[in-house]
Structures are given as structure tokens and as C-alpha cells.
Amino acid sequence: MRFVLAGYGSRGDVEPFAAVGKELLRRGHDVCMAVAPNMLGFVESAGLAGVAFGPDSSRLLDEEHVRNRKMQNPISVMVEGMDHLTRLWAEWRTTLTALADGADLVLTGLPEQRFAANVAEYRGIPLAVLDFFPNQHWHPGALGRLIEQMAKETEDAQRRELGLSEATGASTSLEIQAYEQLCFPGLAAESAEHGELRPVRPFVGALTLELPTDADDEVLSWIAAGTAPIYFGFGSAMRVETDVTVATISTACAQLGERALICSGLSDFGHIPHSGHVKVVREVKHAAVFAACRAVVHHGGAGTTAAGMRAGIPTLILWLPVADQPIWAAVVERLKVGFGREFSTTTAESLTADLRMILAPEYAARARKVATQMTKPAESVASAADLLEETARRGR
């Protein structure tokens, strides 16, 4: 069978699609992925055929960019957002319509769902969606509502271009919940209450490629030579103020007598001097390194949050007011395996206090207990692939 997978965003947004795509490819299917141009190399490195669409996504969650947007006139922000989305949606429609010709199923994410649904209807094939958090837990502000209206107008125009009648409701066959059910108790029962009014929404757990990095062996050797460190990472799309960030981390860990492992990601920490209790690398394999750490501090991406929970260590989420990051901060707090704070309010003093709290034995004990309830990565990928195969066969 032929599967078209399309996801726009950073590595954290794209990797779940690549993980299930790689499994489908292993099973003998034809798989093609549509991603932002800056993610094309990543997809191809995983052995998948890729097609680029839309503008570069690397700056969308950049901390400086987000901070500057908050300081701008709302009109300027709106114009910038409209320009970006107009370009993205136009390329998205053209690219996906072409790729879906001859496909058996289209898999996409929540932001692209409405446009993908039109393409799937036009091609007469089923549509599946990957959800990284419950979409009913996300409440857009005024700008988000304006964008929603823009999207609806664009969707209507797309349907007219494709010769489709006016949409009457959701046309998704399958919505895979790529996170753990335990993170949102009651959600499965809520979906069941709606019965046939909603698509199938199975929980499979987080989807990851678990790719090794060049730094893994070096980092594990450094960890083995001393006490277990605290991991600090900021995701694949976030740049931070390097000098201030390293100084804040170094000061807090020194006060607590802890070592710090900092993964710089897109930020350049190489020129910044740091103390002997701090090690800086670009990236590590979470599955290999997290279990050797005392705790994990990160931005609150769905994938990193799941990796920390699977490793059975406490979590501190320093979130930006974008996407699902505040949602995952609330999850670790509710499960009592961590704490959340907005990144912009973090100081050396607050970081010291927050780390002291989550390093308490009771947090570690609860984190270990939650880890036993998490789905294994290989099982998550296999379950997602099974669901997609079954949906594609039914749609033939």
C-alpha cells in the first residue's frame, strides 16, 4: 500500500510521523513524507522519501522570536501570521493534492487536518491524524480565533477548487492519540460518550525514532565518572539567550551540589565558559541518557515529556506560551512527577527552588511508578502502524 505522511514544524513535530513511516516502510509499504524544507534532511536520514513544502519552520518557536512577537503591535503580529499561513496553506494544498494521487491513506497532524480532509475526500481515500495532545485541551486566544476563521475561509475555497460540496462535518477516519491515556484520565470515557459522532481515537503512546547521536558514548562516560546529572534541553526549535541560560543553570546546580548536562540544540553554547560541574553537547539520545540522570529540565514538548516519564525521573518544564507546552507542564504537576514554570520568569533563585522540590525522594518514587505504566516505544510504533494498515484496507 502507499501512505502519504505530512507534518509541518520542528523535529519534535516531524519525528512521530517519521517513526511510524519507517515502520510502514519496514513492512513493505510505499511511504512518502511532506515536511518543511529544513526538515527534509532529517526525514531522508531516517530512510524515507521526502518532499518539501512551505517556508522554513525553524524560527517559529525561537524564544527571541516569540518574545519579540509579544512586544509587537498586535496588528503587526496578525499581518506576519497571515502572510506565513497564506504561504504555508497554499503550498500545502498543492503538494498534498499531488502526493495523494494513487495513495491508500493520508496521515497528517491537527493543524493540517481540515485541508488534508478535503484532499482525502477528493482522492477517495481515508484520512488519519496524529494528535500529540487532546485538541479539546487547547484554547486559542483572539489571534487564534482569527486564524481559525482564516483557515475556514481557505478550506471553503479549497473545496470549491476541488469541486467538492460544502463540508458537513469531520471526515477523519482515525485520530491516533500519540500520548499516554494516563496523562488525561477520563478522556477515553468522554470520547466513548460521543460514540459514532467522533472518529476512532486509540491511545498508542509517544512515537519516536530513538536515533543515536555522536555524543552519546562521550556523555555516558562523563555521567559514569561522577554523580548522576540533571539534564537541561530546550527542544529542536527553540533558541535561548546562551550566556544567561548557562549562568543560571550553573549557579542553581552549584548551590545544590549537582552536575548539569546541557543540550544546546539550535543555540550556540560553544563559546561560553562553564564550570567543571557542567557539560554542554548539542544533542543526545533521550532513551539512552535520561535513565542515567537524576532529573530532566526541558521546554515541555510532547516527545521530551514522554521520554522523561519513560525514564522514570522527575521533570521540570520551563515552557513558552505556545502550542502544547503549558499543557504538558500541567500534566507532570497533576501526576506529581514534576513542576512547570514559564521560561521567561525563570531565575537562578527560582530554578534552584524548583530543582530542590523535584529532587525530593517522593517525586523520584512517583516518577518510577509512572514509568511502569508507560507504553514501550517499539509497541507504540507497531500499534500506530497496525491502525494505519487496517484503516487503509477498510478504505479500499
Regions found by a protein language model. Give the residues of each.
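C-terminal amphipathic helix plus adjacent low-complexity
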Residues: A348-R396
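Conserved nucleotide-sugar donor-interacting segment of glycosyltransferase catalytic cores
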Residues: L85-K152, L182
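Phosphate/nucleotide-donor binding subsite
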Residues: A49-D104
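Donor-nucleotide binding loops and adjacent catalytic segments primarily
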Residues: L182-A295
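N-terminal subdomain of nucleotide-sugar transferases
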Residues: M1-A49
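A donor-sugar binding/catalytic signature common to diverse glycosyltransferases
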Residues: L105-T108, V281-A329
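Active-site-proximal region of nucleotide-activated glycan assembly enzymes
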Residues: I125-G186, S191-P199
